[in-house]
Amino acid sequence: MARAFLVVMDSVGIGGAPDAAHYFNGDVPDTGANTLGHIRAACDAGQANDGRSGALQLPNLARLGLWHAEALAVGEPVPDHPAHGQWGVATEVSRGKDTPTGHWELAGLPVPWDWTYFPDTNPSFPVEISNAVQVAAGTDGILGNCHASGTRIIAELGEAHMRTGWPICYTSADSVFQIAAHEESFGLKRLYQLCETMAPMLHDMHVGRIIARPFIGQPGAFERTVNRKDYAVQPPGPIVMDWVKDAGGHVYGVGKIGDIFSMQGIDEVHKGSDADLMKHLSNLVDGAKDGSLTFANFVEFDSLFGHRRDVAGYARHLEWFDAAIGQLFDR
């Protein structure tokens, strides 16, 4: 019996959707978005030579039809050489550009409501949310309360967090409420409990995810860990994982898939860094059950390189992924 493997390269976009002008990063609309194409152009221009050099090399993904799909998405002529895989592009019908929206649609369930987004102001959160965090955390206040990059706000407020014990709360252009805390001084279990306590209130407001963002280290050398955990709204209807299970199949989640879908329809989850996830995926290629679905998300494109606008790092990760996934194709 056949098996299916659905692999998401998180944030690796190949062109803006028709409604891109309705979405923003700060004051800049998403019109003309094309993460992959822009990284390739930067590589061609010699602007991504840190730890690598030259043109972007993705032979295995290209063989599947990656550049054919990218050309179609941005309205350019597709390459003359044939692809050896089936390729295409899709446009979301839901309103939103965040993780739950995209993944739910991949799983067959458009989002039936508009998500709640917090304004890019200071403070960003209503008083009732800030007060609820303080009560749940047992603190006299919170830090942040704004739009921010996770790595930057941890660098800026991590020392104050360790001194006061106040959680760092922030958001972004997505429908998220993120809480960062030090794994040792605040406690990882305590951070998870805080997020679990806040999740029902925020989910009722149609905030898509509450994200625990643990970090370690000392001032000047803070580092986020792989112990991130997402508390997402439960899908309001059946998804492809449910259909697989109804047919008697087994569903494997790799990466943050379990968190994104609140474990709906998922039998087991394998987590870790992207390097760990590739090993898990390799093992599942060898050992996943007949009739099963493996749904994987490789998040470090976004978390380590996209948010930081690290073009060279993103290109390195793309080339690493291409080489690693190519070994699986050969099996």
Task: Locate the predicted segments by residue.
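Extreme N-terminal starter segment of soluble prokaryotic enzymes
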Residues: M1-F5
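Active-site nucleophile/metal-coordination loop of metallo-enzymes that catalyze phosphate/sulfate
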Residues: S11-G165, Y170-H182, F186, R213, ...
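Short acidic, glycine/proline-rich loop/turn micro-motifs
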Residues: P18-A20, A180, M263-I266, F305-V311
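Active-site regions of oxyanion-processing enzymes, predominantly non-cytosolic
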Residues: G165-I168, V207-I210, L281-D302
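Extended, H/D-rich, highly charged conserved domains that either
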Residues: A181-H182, L188-G255
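Short acidic/His/Gly/Ser-rich catalytic and metal-binding motifs that mark active-site loops
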Residues: Q218-A221, I260-M263, D302-H307
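Functional beta-strand-loop-alpha-helix junction segments that form "active/interaction loops"
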Residues: G253-L281
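A long, amphipathic alpha-helix that forms part
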Residues: S282, D302-R331
